From Swiss-Prot:
Residue span of region DCB: 2-224
GO MF entry, a single one: protein kinase A regulatory subunit binding
Gene name of this polypeptide: ARFGEF1
Protein source organism: Bos taurus (Bovine)
Name by which UniProt lists this protein: Brefeldin A-inhibited guanine nucleotide-exchange protein 1
SUBUNIT field: Homodimer. Interacts with ARFGEF2/BIG2; both proteins are probably part of the same or very similar macromolecular complexes. Interacts with FKBP2. Interacts with MYO9B. Interacts with PRKAR1A and PRKAR2A. Interacts with PPP1CC. Interacts with NCL, FBL, NUP62 and U3 small nucleolar RNA. Interacts with DPY30. Interacts with PDE3A. Interacts with KANK1. Interacts with TBC1D22A and TBC1D22B.
Amino acid sequence: MYEGKKTKNMFLTRALEKILADKEVKKAHHSQLRKACEVALEEIKAETEKQSPPHGEAKAGSSTLPPVKSKTNFIEADKYFLPFELACQSKCPRIVSTSLDCLQKLIAYGHLTGNAPDSTTPGKKLIDRIIETICGCFQGPQTDEGVQLQIIKALLTAVTSQHIEIHEGTVLQAVRTCYNIYLASKNLINQTTAKATLTQMLNVIFARMENQALQEAKQMEKERHRQHHHLLQSPVSHHEPESPQLRYLPPQTVDHIPQEHEGDLDPQTNDVDKSLQDDTEPENGSDISSAENEQTEADQATAAETLSKNDILYDGENHDCEEKPQDIVQSIVEEMVNIVVGDTGERTTINVSADGNNGTIEDGSDSENIQANGIPGTPISVAYTPSLPDDRLSVSSNDTQESGNSSGPSPGAKFSHILQKDAFLVFRSLCKLSMKPLSDGPPDPKSHELRSKILSLQLLLSILQNAGPIFGTNEMFINAIKQYLCVALSKNGVSSVPEVFELSLSIFLTLLSNFKTHLKMQIEVFFKEIFLYILETSTSSFDHKWMVIQTLTRICADAQSVVDIYVNYDCDLNAANIFERLVNDLSKIAQGRGSQELGMSNVQELSLRKKGLECLVSILKCMVEWSKDQYVNPNSQTTLGQEKPSEQETSEMKHPETINRYGSLNSLESTSSSGIGSYSTQMSGTDNPEQFEVLKQQKEIIEQGIDLFTKKPKRGIQYLQEQGMLGTTPEDIAQFLHQEERLDSTQVGEFLGDNDKFNKEVMYAYVDQHDFSGKDFVSALRMFLEGFRLPGEAQKIDRLMEKFAARYLECNQGQTLFASADTAYVLAYSIIMLTTDLHSPQVKNKMTKEQYIKMNRGINDSKDLPEEYLSAIYNEIAGKKISMKETKELTIPAKSSKQNVASEKQRRLLYNLEMEQMAKTAKALMEAVSHVQAPFTSATHLEHVRPMFKLAWTPFLAAFSVGLQDCDDTEVASLCLEGIRCAIRIACIFSIQLERDAYVQALARFTLLTVSSGITEMKQKNIDTIKTLITVAHTDGNYLGNSWHEILKCISQLELAQLIGTGVKPRYISGTVRGREGSLTGAKDQAPDEFVGLGLVGGNVDWKQIASIQESIGETSSQSVVVAVDRIFTGSTRLDGNAIVDFVRWLCAVSMDELLSTTHPRMFSLQKIVEISYYNMGRIRLQWSRIWEVIGDHFNKVGCNPNEDVAIFAVDSLRQLSMKFLEKGELANFRFQKDFLRPFEHIMKRNRSPTIRDMVVRCIAQMVNSQAANIRSGWKNIFSVFHLAASDQDESIVELAFQTTGHIVTLVFEKHFPATIDSFQDAVKCLSEFACNAAFPDTSMEAIRLIRHCAKYVSDRPQAFKEYTSDDMNVAPEDRVWVRGWFPILFELSCIINRCKLDVRTRGLTVMFEIMKTYGYTYEKHWWQDLFRIVFRIFDNMKLPEQQTEKAEWMTTTCNHALYAICDVFTQYLEVLSDVLLDDIFAQLYWCVQQDNEQLARSGTNCLENVVILNGEKFTLEIWDKTCNCTLDIFKTTIPHALLTWRPISGETAPPTPSPVSENQLDTISQKSVDIHDSIQPRSADNRQQAPLASVSTVNEEISKIKPTAKFPEQKLFAALLIKCVVQLELIQTIDNIVFFPATSRKEDAENLAAAQRDAVDFDVRVDTQDQGMYRFLTSQQLFKLLDCLLESHRFAKAFNSNNEQRTALWKAGFKGKSKPNLLKQETSSLACGLRILFRMYTDESRASAWEEVQQRLLNVCSEALSYFLTLTSESHREAWTNLLLLFLTKVLKISDNRFKAHASFYYPLLCEIMQFDLIPELRAVLRRFFLRIGVVFQISQPPEQELGINKQ
């Protein structure tokens, strides 16, 4: 303690002694000073003695600590100060210096704190007086330089010292003094020191304010831990030990700043700054001590974390605060948010500060700040969004309530406000200083005004750059920025002084970085009125443009800013389209447009262009950066053999090297240089891209409507109504005209003045929406005319004024001035005339006041208006004209012609005028928006980039295209290329196809590779373009889609160029060049092929030119280019599934173009296709199959290329790829091999070249031989190719294909059967095709043998088929053997039968039935149904050959054969087939007998007989019914009715005999008549089977005998009739055979005859048919049915044979040869068969029930037969009946006597008649016996002995 005091005393003593010792002090005028020093010295001495400590405590206090204060100390300090005060007031610099030096040290070491009240001025502290004294030492420029320096030091110490506190006016005074020293001092060192001091002071003032908030935040954190149950209890600040003297200052000292301190800093004007009080009152509210202090606690808490961040960002201070505050603040904010949001509803006491809406404004900004600085990991925005405006209110109310209960307000909180006020005052003063106008004329760099302006701006910049969170968020400062700083900037931002202008720009940049969320409107004004205006106006100077564009470079490099500008302005209905305009302006600058008028040098123009390009590229880079999360780098992953990596993996996999490969494309180097990107701030709810897009669309509609309105108002309004943006009522439209400021005012006037009814309604509504209440007439008129320009026509003005007057009176009904509306109307008109007269330059003689008054005489209902009234109007108009609304042009002023700007000087003058106007506008606008609170959205979504890019892609493209086109500067080119790269990236990421394609096409165009004359002009920039294009392909391949076409086209051309560059002859396809060699070798002046190929040169060549071309494109062959191109193809494995398909698709397209070139087809791309196929084969199969779909299709086309070399290359490549692909094998049920090998099929199908076909077959054969074990689904294609080869006519192709097929069927099937099952059908089909190739019969037979071999596989391995699953899952497992095995084999055999020549088809038929017979036992019932559907196709009439002879042969051979085979199979598998097949067989037989083929017809009946005889025993009743019905049907359809009805057509050829034929002759002829059936060979049991093999039908011979003269239709008819006759007879025979077994009847007849010859009486010659015939299986009804058929047939034959006339006619017409036709055999055999059946039934005991009917039928039939016999005239006819009669008589003789009686009595007379004929002996013998029996039975006579006992039953 003692030591401290001692130090202090030592200082004081020395200083006082030094002052006393000064010789000046000795002078009289310093007596007071001298005395004060002496008194002070004495006191010090006395005090020292009094307080000297006892011995032991000498070291008790640390000498470094300031002493503890007590009341006495204050008084002492006061005493000590007086001598220094007097010393400072002395005029002697030395004394002043000494005094200042001592004060500075005392303050520095804490010995002088000045905390005591000032005894001279109540309400102030001593320290204020001390500072005032120090400041007073500066007396202006004449002050001693040493003193100046001491003042600066003392003030800096005072402001920065830890030990004293100075506030408000005192701080201002200290700052002002330093400022003035800087301006006034002539000494450069002093100036520099003053400036540095100012900077440091400001740093301290603002840093203190921020630190205090941080302390408070820490304090609150402690408090929070201490009291968990409350959100905030009034925190008692426990201050740190190093500042124990902090005290709470009464509120009034804070609130009310005494006026003498408020002067501005500028020395020239020390006026009192009154505005301070007005400003600060509402901002701080009435009671800062309670409510507001606490209200800011939250601000400080929330701001603390940002403080640490910002310090790091700005100047690296406060590193120690970096970590803890973050954690502290995080927890505070989190809890606060949760509780506040929860409690909002309950808190009602809201303390709103004096200006009423302060609460809400402040709240908005604060809560927004909390969100902005939202701590990572806490969902603050979620918690905060619901009630932004209320949150802060509730916090403040909560604080207020609690502070009432607490023991006393916390000093810390109050103190913080004083610090804020200090900062605020300094900031505001600097703003005001910067606004001071400069003197007119060219600015003088040394003038105080300019230096002051520059210094103030520099200091403001420094404050802003180092601003902490309180400054950035506190309402007071934000308002200060809006009201003072922005207005100041709007004045300085157009300064012609470069330094001022530049500083303004820097300040603007800082504002944009750190404060943009609060300054939405201000930023808009800045861009619109200053930046863009300077860029757009042609007169602005290069320097200005340059500085603006430099600034823009900074802005454009920050992604957050760029996106924010778009979201907040372009997507805001009421804001200008700043982003769009910015891009357009930059694009124009980058294109070098408009530089002519600027008078710029070329160098300047180029540097400006580069800057413009740089900005554009920066913007695009930002957009890339912003959307980088959407981009997947193809090179950081591979698509081979794995799925896409997950989101996490992808982000981890973006290795630094891949990211940095393209500078800042994946991640721009740094965006937070300005701190913009460091945190996002949010005000208006959430950032919803869709919502903004909708707004943008609406805005575009409105803008379009406004454009249309400018051209034609009605059209504009109609458009907006159609788009739903404007209502239809006049009121809606009027409101729109009021509110929409962008409308052209002239057009608005025209529209309102129009005489149209609707327009008038709108005009009335428009005027009615004005409220003129309480306004004087002129003000009302001014207000009315502000909205539009009056139209020119008097009538229109008339209407408007009339309505205006009416509305004015309506609003001001209490006025007494105007008698009526008419008065107002006339007066309004006169005012407009007056304004025109007084202010129009065209009017030379201006109207005087008297004239004006005179003009208005008598207008008030014939009275005058008061003269003084009119006089006042005149004066007002003369002073200020009525200005109508001007239309503000946003567009760039039209290019001023050369005359306008004759010289640079004039241009400058014009520009300065423009700048002044601009400054006025900007200032006015700035002031207008200074109180507007506009919500600012901080963009966070990457989706915004899409609409941004869509909006601006054209100006970007224009700038880059023009740059590349017309400028050879490498930097320009590299910027353009980089820009295009970024643009492509964005278009890619968001898949905006049109734009992407446009950029890629532009890039491709500038490679000059695709232009016909391109390569000759190739420069470095074109080479770079090629490299860029390749890079794009490498980095953006996943997104390129159709743009691959351009890229691959260029790469294809590049290869050609490289060949020329290296002088290598391109490898054309030999075939085409061969033809041209002859013509080329002769002419030595002609260019080599490749030059012609590229379209480089015409016929004759300048070889020098070629050399230079080779040189210029040599660069394209550089290793780096070659490798890069190669990398595109090798890297194709990394493209994703869709991208690789696009890539391949366009590679194929380019390859196609190369190959289609008429002059020089090339195979570059084709080779690349093969390469990428190799690379990508490892992809997952799903992707690979999509790739191959495209490549395979390409191979299809290339393999069919007319140029054989191309096709050979394609097929060979296919072979190699296939081999590799097959090595991979294939799992069951996949079909990739099938897809892969399909091109072989296609080529085989379409390419007719034997060479290629042979090659395809060889390739496939090679695959089979080497890869058989791996082939699965590929077998299908292999068989398909062989199938196509099988029908070839070239022996070697067929031979090789068949050999291989045979190898597969015999060996491969054996080993790998399960793998081949899927293509088993194809194999069989293929063999069938070989069998059907008529050119190679041996192969055909061998093929059928192999099919038979296949059947063995099916039989041996049914399980394999059952287990095989495939596409046809709907096939039941048990049916798979059939569907995939048996059916194909049998079907193909049926195809062979249907397609081949006789010997092959016969073999096929044999094998087919052989298979059925061999393996049929394994077949299911429904399989047989399918099978016979195939088999019966053999008989399908539609499929039979057309030619008659072939058809006949077919029927005679194949059908015949098949029919017998079917019956055999049926018999073999009767049990299964009876239900299945019988109906079909009957139907088929029925079909056979209907064909015009005798052989087939016979076979049909024959087969019917076989089937029934062989299987009848097993037939059911139902089947017998079917059998009988079938027989019946055949019978009915084959009765040749036409024989009876046929009539010769008139004009029939005459009979062969020319002479008329007499009856006798006819009769003799009739006796020789020919039986139609004579030609039929008798059927014996043995020859039945051979019948089918009879080569040609006998009927055919008969047909040929038919008269050649007969007409063809008749010939056909007769042939058919003949066949029907044959069938009838066959059928009778069949029935006989079925019922009684074949040959039985014939034997019986023979025996009957023999017996008759012997005249034997032994009637036991009964042939036993019991065992064999089917008689016993037929029911009586069925037998009767058959009988009916037989008898009908018999009757028909009888009718025909009796019809002599008809027979003659037929004979004459050529039917049946030389003699008349008859049907004797049919007549007799049908009856014979009928009789046998009836007699058999008659004697059958089991049919006793039918005997009665049988007897009746017998009697009728027999009597009818006998009667008919008696009518026969012809000998031969009677002879035919011999056997019949024998049969009849024999049978009757054998019946019992009873029955015999009945019969004999019935036939007796007829038999008597018969005896008159000349009968043969046998018949006579039987008749004799018959009559004898009659005698005995009727007991007429006794029987002879040998006959006794016979038939007595």
